[in-house]
Amino acid sequence: MGNTEIVAMILAGGQGSRLGVLTKKLAKPAVPFGGKYRIIDFPLSNCANSGIYTVGVLTQYKPLELNAHIGIGLPWDLDRKDGGVSILPPYQEEKGGNWYKGTANAIYQNIEFVDRYDPEYVLILSGDHIYKMNYTKMLEFHKEKNADATIGVIEVPVNEASRFGIMNTRDDMSIYEFEEKPKIPKSNLASMGIYIFNWKTLKKYLRNDEANKSSSNDFGKDIIPSMLNDGGKMVAYPFEGYWKDVGTIESLWQANMDLLKSDNKLNLHDQDWRIYSTNPVRPAQYIGENAKVTNSLIVEGCTVNGTVQNSVLFQGVQVGKNTIIKDSVIMTNAKIGDNVIIEKAIIGNDAVIRKDCVIGTGDEIEIVAAKEEVKMGSIMKNSKAV
């Protein structure tokens, strides 16, 4: 294959159990976001925009829709003879196969894939975060620091720090302490789950970790602490842009709502750093004569005959007459009947809401699953149908 300076490996096998019915039939990285994207589009687009064209996507849970979405990688310019994008399911041995045992084991099982390109560096990414980042700048930082490993970090609120891998650094950003999800965090500098390793070094640690039967085969719990204990040079790369772990209903809803803010830091309209996706051709949106739309994202193919406020409507959504949708996310091809009220809710793909229904309006975010039908006159509040 020849030498490639850096290979990206995207961990995209997550079940996303905290997203409930939204991930019942698909992997978390395939969950729709922002009107016309899926979560996996963000790391894939970041790779393409960073000039990284050799990418492995490690799939596992319910991969069919994710695999179909990625295809041969055309939207991200990853349909290449040399390199490009490769879908990497768990390795199947003659004795039978197992799921990836952890993030480190997932990379271990694909050592042969990475070795085909003989890279100097490997970039490890999570497939379920929303952000825009230039990985080339992170690689330059890694080289300047002459590091064995570089971890992307972001400051988080202190009261949320226990949800993340937390590290302490010196003034030169070298890491001297790392704790995975500590009960009492010593700082608020959190790992973004973005790593650059010298490949030869990482390969040694992956093999040692695999041989350790007591290991959980995880980067945060095993690989990073082992490298630190051995005196490896590890540095933190600070990131100050928008970054969201959308692993919960609340965070997914909030990330969509963030797109509607006037000071939105993600800025999906930035032509210099576009987010690419697989999008079918749709007719132009139609806004009816009695419709009212304010502060919302309405994607092509939508038909709106009601009121839409502060909401995100994906492709092909139909909104009936005298219907009010507020603070909500309505996913692809959902059909909303007449005289419906939807507030603070996520409506899944191809869901059907019959007329005269009330969904949401409570303190918690209401969820309607993909392809679910809500019968005429139903009231759904705090996940209880009446």
UniProtKB/Swiss-Prot annotation:
Catalytic reaction annotation: alpha-D-glucose 1-phosphate + ATP + H(+) = ADP-alpha-D-glucose + diphosphate
CDD domains associated with the record: ADP_Glucose_PP, LbH_G1P_AT_C
Keyword Transferase set for record: yes
Pfam families assigned: Hexapep_GlmU (PF24894), NTP_transferase (PF00483)
Molecular function GO terms recorded: ATP binding; glucose-1-phosphate adenylyltransferase activity
Listed EC numbers: 2.7.7.27
EC supergroup of this enzyme: transferase
Keyword annotations from UniProtKB, A to Z: ATP-binding, Carbohydrate metabolism, Glycogen biosynthesis, Glycogen metabolism, Nucleotide-binding, Nucleotidyltransferase, Transferase
GO biological process: glycogen biosynthetic process
Pathway: Glycan biosynthesis; glycogen biosynthesis
Top-rank taxon: Bacteria
Binding annotation for alpha-D-glucose 1-phosphate: 100, 165, 180-181, 191
Matching InterPro entries: ADP-Glc_PPase, ADP_Glu_pyroP_CS, GlgC_bac, GlmU/GlgC-like_hexapep, NTP_transferase_dom, Nucleotide-diphossugar_trans, Trimer_LpxA-like_sf
Purpose: Involved in the biosynthesis of ADP-glucose, a building block required for the elongation reactions to produce glycogen. Catalyzes the reaction between ATP and alpha-D-glucose 1-phosphate (G1P) to produce pyrophosphate and ADP-Glc.
Subunit structure: Homotetramer.
Similarity remark: Belongs to the bacterial/plant glucose-1-phosphate adenylyltransferase family.
Name under which the protein is recorded: Glucose-1-phosphate adenylyltransferase
Organism: Clostridium botulinum (strain Alaska E43 / Type E3)
